[in-house]
Amino acid sequence: MGANQLVVLNVYDMYWMNEYTSSIGIGVFHSGIEVYGREFAYGGHPYPFSGIFEISPGNASELGETFKFKEAVVLGSTDFLEDDIEKIVEELGKEYKGNAYHLMHKNCNHFSSALSEILCGKEIPRWINRLAYFSSCIPFLQSCLPKEWLTPAALQSSVSQELQDELEEAEDAAASASVASTAAGSRPGRHTKL
């Protein structure tokens, strides 16, 4: 294995909402795991591919205007190499698909905790995901939350790129099929007399 790399939880305050929720003891936070100078996070979108995305560590502006960097929490260290971490994130992407996002059961903080457990054997602090706990007690709470909370700006551009790539692949495949059928049609064929 490689060098001992710090595993850091970057926590973001959804500050305009926290003006209201902090008075009742519930913060609304987004989180991501930083390792090897890269930050991995998870968000929802309506498609059946990975909702995991990458941003510059601690850069709240990449998440959107409703986010503000709150703090970095050192969770531990890992001996995984950077290539190993990419494979781990890719595997987690099969479970953390965009259309599987759920505020109570599978949100960004659940992802951060899962990745942290794999990398350094520790869950994230409980206070970061307190909203999920309370919303499981008050089911209608999720329907009251703005849709943009589910899909941070950084993920929206990642999803747009993924969809653009899929469209280009489909167009390339269609063009190849068209060229192949045209070429096949211009080949001399067998002619038989009846």
Curated annotation (Swiss-Prot):
A GO CC term assigned to this protein in UniProt: cytoplasm
Gene behind the chain: DESI2
Activity regulation description: Palmostatin B inhibits its palmitoyl protein thioesterase activity.
Disordered: region residues: 165-194
Classification lineage: Eukaryota, Metazoa, Chordata, Craniata, Vertebrata
Organism from which the protein derives: Homo sapiens (Human)
Disulfide-linked positions: none
The protein's name: Deubiquitinase DESI2
Main location, first listed in the record: cytoplasm
Low complexity bias (residue ranges): 173-186
Keywords of this entry: Cytoplasm, Hydrolase, Protease, Ubl conjugation pathway
Function: Has deubiquitinating activity towards 'Lys-48'- and 'Lys-63'-linked polyubiquitin chains. Deubiquitinates 'Lys-48'-linked polyubiquitination of RPS7 leading to its stabilization. Exhibits palmitoyl protein thioesterase (S-depalmitoylation) activity towards synthetic substrates 4-methylumbelliferyl-6-S-palmitoyl-beta-D-glucopyranoside and S-depalmitoylation probe 5 (DPP-5).
A GO BP annotation: proteolysis
Pfam families associated with the record: Peptidase_C97
